[in-house]
Design a protein with these regions (language model features):
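Non-catalytic helical tethers at domain boundaries
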Residues: 1-127
């Protein structure tokens, strides 16, 4: 595996572990701006690195999650359903990363189901 890709997989897995914990904390304390900023920063970093490395599937998932997190930063209330949806996105990203590590390329497939759910949630919390 390319060193840059190996480092990306390692760092992203570490970030995802932190995200899991932070999302649970955020669900318990949705008005905590520090937790929200940390979550947003981690997702934004993952998205940006995916774009740099040419991983469009991962980038699209991270972008959709980042957009929803941005709504929370703008003051929209975070529901349990929204946090669960972001956790499902994190799980999907982990699955894709496992395949990326094994196959040394992003797996084929689409994530329109999850991205559409995230987009619908953005519309719901944004209105």
């Amino acid at each position: 595996m390319d060193d840059l890709l190996r480092e990306f997989v390692t760092e992203t897995n570490e970030s995802l572990d932190v995200l899991d914990v932070e999302l649970v904390r955020f669900e318990q304390d949705p008005n905590n701006a520090k937790i929200l900023d940390n979550i947003f920063r981690l997702v934004h970093t993952i998205k940006g690195t995916c774009g740099f490395l040419g991983l469009p599937r991962l980038e699209a998932l991270a972008h959709a999650a980042e957009t929803l997190m941005g709504k929370f930063r703008d003051g929209a209330p975070a529901s349990t359903e929204a946090v669960t949806l972001i956790l499902a996105t994190i799980d999907r990203i982990k699955t894709i990363l496992e395949s990326l590590e094994r196959e040394q390329r992003e797996p084929e497939g689409g994530d329109t189901d999850l991205i559409s759910s995230l987009e619908r949630m953005v519309e719901r919390v944004g209105s």
